[in-house]
C-alpha cells in the first residue's frame, strides 16, 4: 500500500534486471499516488531504459506538468533525450533548452545540445555547450568524439589530436572510436 515502499522495490527490481517485477511495483506505487511527479519521472526513466520511448514520453510529460516539482529540469532533460530517440529533433531542442533554463548545470542536457547544434552546423553554440559540459562532467566515448569533431571544425589540431588519443586509450573498442578512425 505504501507508494514509497513500492517505488523503492521497483527501483531494486530494475537494478536487478527484473523488468516485469519492476513494472509491477511501479504500477502499484502509481496506483496509490498517480500524480506524484517523482514516481512518474522514475517510471518514465524505467520505460526509457526498456526502449519504450513513446510511453516514457507520456509519463515524463505528466511529471513535467507539476510546476512545483523541484527536479522538473531533470524531467525536461529526460523528455529531450526521449524526443531525440523518437526522431523529434525540434521538440527535443525545446525540451533541452527548457531543462537548461531551469538548471544550467546538467551535463547530459548540455552534451545533447552540443550534439544537436553540431549536427545543425551551428558550431559556435555547439562548442559553448560542449565546454560547459566539460566543466561539469568527465568525458565518455561520445563526448570525446564530439570534442574531436568540434576541434577539427575550429581548426584546433592539437586539441583534436588530444581528444583522439584519449578516445583511443580509454575507449578503443567502441563505435565512437571506429567512427574516429
Model-derived regions: residue spans:
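Structural signature of tandem alpha-helical TPR/SEL1-like repeats
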Residues: 16-28, 50-62, 74, 86-98, ...
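Structural marker of alpha-solenoid helical repeat scaffolds
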Residues: 1, 32-33, 66-68, 102, ...
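Residue-level recognition of tetratricopeptide repeat
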Residues: 2, 36, 70-72, 106, ...
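Alpha-helical solenoid scaffolds that mediate protein-protein interactions
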Residues: 29, 63, 70, 99, ...
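Canonical tetratricopeptide repeat
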Residues: 8-11, 42, 78, 112, ...
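Terminal, low-structured helical/coil segments at or just beyond the last alpha-helical repeat
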Residues: 133-181
